[in-house]
Amino acid sequence: MALFYLDSSAVVKLVRDEPESHVLRACLSDEDLVSCDLVLTEVPRAIRRAVAQDPRLALDVLIERAEAVLEAVALLPLDRALLLAAGAFAEPALRALDAIHIAAAIDLSPVDGFVTYDERQAAGARLAGLRTMAPGS
């Protein structure tokens, strides 16, 4: 089995039915998945934003799906060393939460892929030496 690090944009695509979701689910179906504790906040926030923009979406159903998806993803705890590593990246355009995800993936290295649908984060991950993926995009 391969090990893939998922950022929040990838986790959300596993929860919601978005254009890339089917391909992403197929690509990751038998793989080991990992992220960091940051997704415990980012994913529910993204779901709540989506429901606010599209009232046809059912918040309770999506939150339940998110909980099920997150149970299948190993979560790396955020600690001082990880946060300091994220803060030390030289790339000035790298946003704080993106830097935390990249630092977490590096901490787990080697990972077979860093899965993100955020191009700015993907660029930062590549600069840090990670192989990025966005299945279906």
Language model features by range: what are they?
Residues M1-V39, V51-I63, A128-L130, S137:
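Short, well-structured N-terminal submotif of metal-dependent ribonuclease cores
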Residues L6, S35, P77, A96-A99, ...:
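Short beta-strand scaffold positions
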Residues A10-V11, V39-L40, L82, H101, ...:
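Alpha-helix capping/helix-boundary segments
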Residues L14-V15, A46, G124-A125:
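Residues that scaffold the ATP/ADP-binding catalytic core of kinase and kinase-like folds
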Residues M1-L3, A103-S137:
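Acidic, PIN/NYN-like endoribonuclease modules and their adjacent C-terminal/linker elements
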Residues D30-L33, E71-A74, S109-G113:
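Short active-site oxyanion
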Residues E64-P92, I100-I102:
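Acidic catalytic patch
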